[in-house]
Amino acid sequence: MKTWVIKIGTSILRGTEETSTEEVIETLSRSFTSFLSKGNKIILVTSGAVGLGCQKLNIETRPNDLSTLQATAAVGQVNLMSLYDKVFNKLGHNIAQILITKADFNSRKSFNNASKTLKKLIDLNVIPIVNENDTVANEELKYGDNDTLSALVALAINANKLILLTDIENLYSKDPRNNNDAQPIKEVHNSELKEIKDKNIKNSNNEWGTGGIATKLISAEIATKGGVEVQLVDGTNKKNLIEIFNDNKIGTLFYPVEKPIRNKKSWLSHAIQTVGKITLDDGASFAIKRKGASLLAVGVKDVEGNFTINQAVKIVNTNDKEVAKGLVSISSDKLRSILNNKENNNSSIIVVHRDVLALS
């Protein structure tokens, strides 16, 4: 049995002058049927609520202000789920709506609850349809058109594959719209991904979505580090949908790492939001990266932000490069007090224990 997470972008769902959103969803859902009939499972991560809300309210351009974005998302989400329910009902499939924000994944307990719920739904042969809760979110609306969310969902359920359906054929060496010499990239191994992601790739934003190629590369990096294969595919081509479910190599394949980060450390690395930053000296940086040591107060050079026990912090070296994330054992006030030599006897206190420290 295979479990796949399929992310459907706004550029796919919005359709064209000739094809409605309902027709797009019907084409997509029919392509899933053969895959599901073999006992496989899918979870959909969908965008499109804002776009559909704008259509319903006759708003011609995507709003810029947050309150209007959230209002259109509220209207559009009802329409979006109604379309999914109508189409999947015809094919004899039950669906479930799951609305998530990044804050929901910030708690380990909430992350585990979401994981258990998603797994139970697919055990019951229900197709979960996940979207960011845009009506209450703020940063989420600007963050990545559900690309990052789809990667986190894939990690939460230990998916075999994450499929990113978009409106481009593959990843390219350059933006193909502006560069005639742009070359398609068919395969990306994890050792290459960071360099590709960090290059100055022009974002392929369009008016109705909030994502682009950069967010898809971030999503691919998160998923592959957690052991999930990622496939970037042009979802506007109906033939591609057949090829995907025959497990053919189309679009761009991102291969997972050989030794993935799983469970709690995967959550620490990718799902949790940090509230502060700790700068290490060279010795401490070496100890946690090469020796798997806990972070001690003696190795801390600087502290930024305010945090309390069990909150997450970013841990950087003297060049401000992130080396890890972790949950602190002491507050920022206590740590600053130690650094200011007010408590010399506590310089060996554990700031972040190795069990709750995830290397970047």
Swiss-Prot record:
<dbReference type="GO" id="GO:0003723">
    <property type="term" value="F:RNA binding"/>
</dbReference>
<comment type="function">
    <text>Catalyzes the transfer of a phosphate group to glutamate to form L-glutamate 5-phosphate.</text>
</comment>
<dbReference type="InterPro" id="IPR002478">
    <property type="entry name" value="PUA"/>
</dbReference>
<feature type="binding site">
    <location>
        <position position="7"/>
    </location>
    <ligand>
        <name>ATP</name>
    </ligand>
</feature>
<dbReference type="GO" id="GO:0005829">
    <property type="term" value="C:cytosol"/>
</dbReference>
<feature type="binding site">
    <location>
        <position position="47"/>
    </location>
    <ligand>
        <name>substrate</name>
    </ligand>
</feature>
<comment type="similarity">
    <text>Belongs to the glutamate 5-kinase family.</text>
</comment>
<dbReference type="InterPro" id="IPR001057">
    <property type="entry name" value="Glu/AcGlu_kinase"/>
</dbReference>
<keyword id="KW-0808">Transferase</keyword>
<feature type="binding site">
    <location>
        <position position="146"/>
    </location>
    <ligand>
        <name>substrate</name>
    </ligand>
</feature>
<dbReference type="GO" id="GO:0005524">
    <property type="term" value="F:ATP binding"/>
</dbReference>
<dbReference type="InterPro" id="IPR036393">
    <property type="entry name" value="AceGlu_kinase-like_sf"/>
</dbReference>
<keyword id="KW-0963">Cytoplasm</keyword>
<feature type="binding site">
    <location>
        <position position="134"/>
    </location>
    <ligand>
        <name>substrate</name>
    </ligand>
</feature>
<keyword id="KW-0028">Amino-acid biosynthesis</keyword>
<dbReference type="InterPro" id="IPR001048">
    <property type="entry name" value="Asp/Glu/Uridylate_kinase"/>
</dbReference>
<keyword id="KW-0641">Proline biosynthesis</keyword>
<feature type="domain" description="PUA">
    <location>
        <begin position="275"/>
        <end position="356"/>
    </location>
</feature>
<dbReference type="InterPro" id="IPR036974">
    <property type="entry name" value="PUA_sf"/>
</dbReference>
<dbReference type="GO" id="GO:0055129">
    <property type="term" value="P:L-proline biosynthetic process"/>
</dbReference>
<dbReference type="InterPro" id="IPR015947">
    <property type="entry name" value="PUA-like_sf"/>
</dbReference>
<dbReference type="InterPro" id="IPR005715">
    <property type="entry name" value="Glu_5kinase/COase_Synthase"/>
</dbReference>
<dbReference type="GO" id="GO:0004349">
    <property type="term" value="F:glutamate 5-kinase activity"/>
</dbReference>
<keyword id="KW-0547">Nucleotide-binding</keyword>
<dbReference type="InterPro" id="IPR019797">
    <property type="entry name" value="Glutamate_5-kinase_CS"/>
</dbReference>
<dbReference type="InterPro" id="IPR011529">
    <property type="entry name" value="Glu_5kinase"/>
</dbReference>
<protein>
    <recommendedName>
        <fullName>Glutamate 5-kinase</fullName>
        <ecNumber>2.7.2.11</ecNumber>
    </recommendedName>
</protein>
<feature type="binding site">
    <location>
        <begin position="166"/>
        <end position="167"/>
    </location>
    <ligand>
        <name>ATP</name>
    </ligand>
</feature>
<dbReference type="InterPro" id="IPR041739">
    <property type="entry name" value="G5K_ProB"/>
</dbReference>
<dbReference type="Pfam" id="PF01472">
    <property type="entry name" value="PUA"/>
</dbReference>
<keyword id="KW-0418">Kinase</keyword>
<keyword id="KW-0067">ATP-binding</keyword>
<comment type="pathway">
    <text>Amino-acid biosynthesis; L-proline biosynthesis; L-glutamate 5-semialdehyde from L-glutamate: step 1/2.</text>
</comment>
<feature type="binding site">
    <location>
        <begin position="210"/>
        <end position="216"/>
    </location>
    <ligand>
        <name>ATP</name>
    </ligand>
</feature>
<dbReference type="Pfam" id="PF00696">
    <property type="entry name" value="AA_kinase"/>
</dbReference>
